[in-house]
Amino acid sequence: MHVTSVVVRGMLFTCMMGCSLLAQRSRRYSDAPDPERATQDWLDQCRDSNNRNGDDRERFCEVREKRLDPSRGLDIDGRQNGGVSVHGWDRPQVLVLAKIQADGEDVDEARDIASQIEIQTADGRVRAEGPSTRRHQSWAVSYEVWAPQQTDLHLVTQNGGISVQNIDGRLELTAVNGGIALNGVSGDVHGQTTNGPLNVELDGGRWRGNGLDLQTTNGPVNLSLPDGYSAHLETGTVNGGMRIDFPITLQGNIGRRIATDLGDGGPTIRAITTNGPVNIRRR
């Protein structure tokens, strides 16, 4: 196990008229961040965020590296304070960077808190267990993960976002206070958040798999898709505007929800919100 650590201080509705799969995959993999660079960037960010609000506590930042067998899929729980980000890559293993942040009244106390945090990874279930804390103490663990493109994911967060890039599989995504961001995903994808945006960027000519079903209670829907993309699109909002920057043919009543076939139709792409705008653009 590789460990890197550092101690630091203290409804308007508008419709405006108007390469190969291998190449796409190659581009996808090149888009994934380098793990070593991601580690250093996070440590720098952890250091820079300390004492910005007059907090005189000391902070200990540490990144622990875990390597897992991808055959069981991944089940990651961010617990109370931690986001989860997953990138698809072309290697036959899973790499997990557990980003640990511990705060205490002095450096030794912060380091001691971090030393009591255990990252559990049995059977592909990733969890952090740590000590109880008192006033002026806290700890949090977030995860950045690299996995084979064909990987099933079950991701849960309470106070943190979920981001998935270039993964094809069965995805179950649940957040409470945090957004869901998807880029180049495919398969059978379901996700929901209570407080946070839905940001989705699709690629290719059509959805590969059973479909996409996302919803948020409080947050916008932002969907970007390539020119000529084919799918059955469903979207809507209760309290918010809706904007689509290309012409569509609506099915059923025009109200707070719309349904339409894009191109030749296909699997359903559904993204809805209760309180927030909907923005769909073609690129």
What are these regions (language model features)?
Residues 60-71, 75, 85-87, 112-174, ...:
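Right-handed parallel beta-helix
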Residues 5-10, 21-87, 91-93, 101-105, ...:
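Short acidic/polar N-terminal linker immediately downstream of export determinants
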Residues 67-69, 188-193, 197-283:
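Short, surface-exposed interaction patches in beta-rich subdomains
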Residues 82, 94, 151, 231:
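Short beta-strand/loop motifs in extracellular/secreted proteins, especially
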Residues 96-97, 102-109, 240-245:
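Short aromatic-acidic-glycine turn motif
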